[in-house]
Amino acid sequence: YEAAYIYKLANKDAPAISGESLLKKAKKAPYAGGQLIDHIFPGIADSVRKKVEYVIRDGIDNGQTNQEIIRRIKGTRQQNYADGLLNQTRSSIDAEVRTARAHISSTTYLDTWIALGYKYTKDVATLDGRTSKGCAMKDGRIQKIGEGHQKPPYHRRCRTTQIGCNSDGAVEGLRPFVADKRAVKDIPKDQRVGKIGQVDANTTYKDWFAQQDESFQREWLGPSKYKLYKEGGYPLDKFVDPLSGQPFTLKQLKAVDEKTFKELGL
């Protein structure tokens, strides 16, 4: 459905898309640090894993939402979850389904952009307080499609996507933001003013973050890193290892810049 929508926007006929073929292709391509999709289900017996894969594949074929697929695997509260495939926590199953689906969707999107003639992709992270530091720094990154090209998911529960673009990465339109760590549904309606809105589609996470208030910045970075950001002149990308995409610890940062830490009393 997602790929067909992109073709529709481009005024082109979409080819038939099979969940079976997509899953096979996605399973051959590593995700998030070299893992294969089979490794998304740690500790699950082989027979059960195959059933989970079937439910995901069938759910995608039938246009089911993440929640509908999760319900089929986890079961329903009315049945005391006895009608689900697995007896695991909701968060664990949720992470597995979302990561697997993101990997399959990412593979489909990339094929779609290539079919539409794009030679570059642009990473688009989510502008909110739940986005990982690594994805925030990847936001707006432009890559040429081909050898060495990276695609999401970059970690479990990764929400970053990619869009086709030209070499300059410029796109039209707006992108949404939520200046809060809570999902929109968890923010009371009387607290949403100023927290939810839209910005130009070419605004990066770093640019957007710089425009947020102190409380949001401090909560996302933590008090010590916030001080380094505001008073020490640290750009956001200095807090993240460019190779692994993982945040540096304060101990690691201090080891290479003890002078700034001393000046700020950290």
Regions found by a protein language model. Name each.
Residues 82-179:
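Acidic, glycine-rich two-metal-ion catalytic cores of nucleic acid-processing enzymes
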Residues 1-79, 173-266:
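N-terminal leader/targeting and assembly helices and adjacent pre-domain segments
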